[in-house]
Amino acid sequence: MNSASTHKNTDFWIFGLFFFLYFFIMATCFPFLPVWLSDVVGLSKTDTGIVFSCLSLFAISFQPLLGVISDRLGLKKNLIWSISLLLVFFAPFFLYVFAPLLHLNIWAGALTGGVFIGFVFSAGAGAIEAYIERVSRSSGFEYGKARMFGCLGWALCATMAGILFNVDPSLVFWMGSGGALLLLLLLYLARPSTSQTAMVMNALGANSSLISTRMVFSLFRMRQMWMFVLYTIGVACVYDVFDQQFAIFFRSFFDTPQAGIKAFGFATTAGEICNAIIMFCTPWIINRIGAKNTLLVAGGIMTIRITGSAFATTMTEVVILKMLHALEVPFLLVGAFKYITGVFDTRLSATVYLIGFQFSKQLAAILLSTFAGHLYDRMGFQNTYFVLGMIVLTVTVISAFTLSSSPGIVHPSVEKAPVAHSEIN
């Protein structure tokens, strides 16, 4: 598929805008969640770690299920409708259920918040990404360029949220619920089409959404699956844990918390704009260096950002390190999908992504989030960052020898149907 066909594709624009709105809504939650938990709710760093552990707990409860459901539904929008409808109640839940429960009992609040946030964001994001990636292969547009719109949505919201948070934090959540109403309208208008190439592949059975339980379980007998999980836990998961409370560390370099939050919002926006530009170019880069090398580059960038934060002493340094996030995200996300569709059976792409990537990250984060929270309280941010950075570096080096660089597809031996090779360009 080329750029011209992508830009003339109606599905590209509809699902690009869907990405924009969904990540706009998500940005009303995650970038400022640790600050909201600390300043508004009044939680300690350890209690904040408990909340994030519960988010991970319920994310891993939902992700395998959503992965299998997504592969079975194919291009049907049932699951996406469920996630979008729940997002309408985002603000009422945070303000009238989540916060009061956290004041009443940390575990009651953390578990309740984990159910909601774990479904609509932690697991829901993976389901939506896997669905749109499937649509991109069926309709004939480039997934990486559609995903770029998500970066722009996050960027716009980060600036608005950074300003509104200092006025009234509740306004940020209501902005998210308002965006969900537009998301429902866009989803109603979405009518995924099928390109001529995809129709031929469907006729051959290459893109069949009919999968069996045996096919799913056979994934866990594959060395390639476990090596991908190792990379995900040791690199992507550790990086996510590092980034969870980075906003608190970031604002410590400013004279007032308000100035730090505002600067964090602007830095996030600038980073996401750069993220979008790089995301647009990522398919071109990945096609030249390969999916494995793309994941290794992402690991190197994450190592630099985490370890660099351990030695940062000025506001300028911490802003530059924050901007490195713009380089890491495109290489990790698009590289992961490229690796999955290049190594595994494309009929199981959503299952591999939600179990091998999202599920494994969240499962490990249950322990790592609480562990990191204790380290923050005992050792401080920078000593903890050094430990996390060394873990990421070590696993990245190991992955250079364990990830597969073969262009051939590995698919369950229990299924003999022909499988075509589909790539994200």
Curated annotation (Swiss-Prot):
<feature type="site" description="Proton translocation">
    <location>
        <position position="305"/>
    </location>
</feature>
<dbReference type="Pfam" id="PF01306">
    <property type="entry name" value="LacY_symp"/>
</dbReference>
<dbReference type="GO" id="GO:0005886">
    <property type="term" value="C:plasma membrane"/>
</dbReference>
<feature type="topological domain" description="Cytoplasmic">
    <location>
        <begin position="70"/>
        <end position="78"/>
    </location>
</feature>
<keyword id="KW-1133">Transmembrane helix</keyword>
<feature type="transmembrane region" description="Helical">
    <location>
        <begin position="317"/>
        <end position="337"/>
    </location>
</feature>
<feature type="transmembrane region" description="Helical">
    <location>
        <begin position="106"/>
        <end position="126"/>
    </location>
</feature>
<feature type="transmembrane region" description="Helical">
    <location>
        <begin position="79"/>
        <end position="99"/>
    </location>
</feature>
<dbReference type="InterPro" id="IPR000576">
    <property type="entry name" value="LacY/RafB_perm_fam"/>
</dbReference>
<dbReference type="GO" id="GO:0015528">
    <property type="term" value="F:lactose:proton symporter activity"/>
</dbReference>
<feature type="site" description="Substrate binding">
    <location>
        <position position="129"/>
    </location>
</feature>
<protein>
    <recommendedName>
        <fullName>Raffinose permease</fullName>
    </recommendedName>
</protein>
<dbReference type="InterPro" id="IPR020846">
    <property type="entry name" value="MFS_dom"/>
</dbReference>
<feature type="topological domain" description="Cytoplasmic">
    <location>
        <begin position="287"/>
        <end position="294"/>
    </location>
</feature>
<comment type="subunit">
    <text>Monomer.</text>
</comment>
<keyword id="KW-0997">Cell inner membrane</keyword>
<feature type="topological domain" description="Periplasmic">
    <location>
        <begin position="100"/>
        <end position="105"/>
    </location>
</feature>
<feature type="site" description="Substrate binding">
    <location>
        <position position="147"/>
    </location>
</feature>
<feature type="site" description="Proton translocation">
    <location>
        <position position="325"/>
    </location>
</feature>
<feature type="transmembrane region" description="Helical">
    <location>
        <begin position="148"/>
        <end position="168"/>
    </location>
</feature>
<feature type="transmembrane region" description="Helical">
    <location>
        <begin position="384"/>
        <end position="404"/>
    </location>
</feature>
<feature type="topological domain" description="Periplasmic">
    <location>
        <begin position="373"/>
        <end position="383"/>
    </location>
</feature>
<keyword id="KW-0813">Transport</keyword>
<feature type="transmembrane region" description="Helical">
    <location>
        <begin position="170"/>
        <end position="190"/>
    </location>
</feature>
<feature type="topological domain" description="Cytoplasmic">
    <location>
        <begin position="191"/>
        <end position="229"/>
    </location>
</feature>
<feature type="transmembrane region" description="Helical">
    <location>
        <begin position="352"/>
        <end position="372"/>
    </location>
</feature>
<keyword id="KW-0472">Membrane</keyword>
<feature type="topological domain" description="Cytoplasmic">
    <location>
        <begin position="405"/>
        <end position="425"/>
    </location>
</feature>
<feature type="topological domain" description="Periplasmic">
    <location>
        <begin position="251"/>
        <end position="265"/>
    </location>
</feature>
<feature type="transmembrane region" description="Helical">
    <location>
        <begin position="49"/>
        <end position="69"/>
    </location>
</feature>
<dbReference type="GO" id="GO:0030395">
    <property type="term" value="F:lactose binding"/>
</dbReference>
<feature type="topological domain" description="Cytoplasmic">
    <location>
        <begin position="338"/>
        <end position="351"/>
    </location>
</feature>
<feature type="transmembrane region" description="Helical">
    <location>
        <begin position="12"/>
        <end position="32"/>
    </location>
</feature>
<dbReference type="InterPro" id="IPR018457">
    <property type="entry name" value="LacY/RafB_perm_fam_CS"/>
</dbReference>
<keyword id="KW-0812">Transmembrane</keyword>
<feature type="transmembrane region" description="Helical">
    <location>
        <begin position="266"/>
        <end position="286"/>
    </location>
</feature>
<feature type="transmembrane region" description="Helical">
    <location>
        <begin position="230"/>
        <end position="250"/>
    </location>
</feature>
<keyword id="KW-0762">Sugar transport</keyword>
<feature type="site" description="Substrate binding and proton translocation">
    <location>
        <position position="272"/>
    </location>
</feature>
<feature type="topological domain" description="Cytoplasmic">
    <location>
        <begin position="127"/>
        <end position="147"/>
    </location>
</feature>
<feature type="topological domain" description="Periplasmic">
    <location>
        <position position="169"/>
    </location>
</feature>
<dbReference type="InterPro" id="IPR036259">
    <property type="entry name" value="MFS_trans_sf"/>
</dbReference>
